[in-house]
Amino acid sequence: MLDTEIPQTHLSSKLEVGIGISADPNPDAAIAEAAGLAGRRLGSATPDFALVVTAGSVARDAVGTLREVLGQISVAGGAATALLTDHGPSREGALVVCVANADGAASGVAATAGRNLCEAGQAAARLVLAGWPFRARYPRGLAFAFARPDGGDAAQTFLASWRDFMGPKMRTVCTVLGGAAAYGRGAAEPLASVVSVEAPYASGIGYTDATPTDGVTPTAETLVHGAADAMLTAVKRLEGRPPRLVVAIESAARLRMLGSALSEEWAAMRGALDEHTPCIGWVGEHVAAYGRGVQPTDAPGALIVVTLGDAPR
């Protein structure tokens, strides 16, 4: 069963982002609280879509709960291992990111099932593209995908099948959820949930991992330096435009390797940003991406930083 939503957009002159976080251990209650916060932070802007990520128990009705607060909004997301915020990691609660597109942008959301993740990735791309009849041959923009595990290389499998249809210009990050649920409307248990934005927004992806050097596993200090470099790379891609949103997505293996140094890693990444720039993230079983300077790999201890800013004037 497949589902996609292409909203009728109330466009604003610039990209607007509202973020809400709740530590309520009840995931549905946490989604409602976080959605309310995110909606209020958007002010008068009308959100086009929302990302919802939970930690701890899986939400019973993530989409329905969020829509009770924000109305008939398109939703993508999933249940992660932990949430990452300026207050430290959280093993329970919810994160909601609401986005109101700028003039000329279009967003599409799809939740897909299938016999395997390859089919789900192809179906998601077809559905999103079908809602963009005005699209260029290869749409340009940014996408966030959430996939349930389906084999040992789930992220690469999704990204390869998605890219076959979407083309090379849609920068895409895929979080593998470690057996937990992907959230979206349509399929009862979707294998994949994805939101994609076609727009000339400035965006950047920074990457680092924990691949051993000469057989030696990186130390926590090395991992912290790698994370700071990934953040600097992602910010540099914006070419001087201030980031509206910064997302750090960490693999569970990296979280284990860091141990108590996780707070140092977050501080190192945060140090590359203005204190008022919103920065959030989550932990998945694995994470991979393709985009400018980044290719999907199965390297251990991956960390991906994504930045999103206004389009050039």
Predicted regions span which residues?
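Hydrophobic alpha/beta core scaffold segments
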Residues: L2-R313
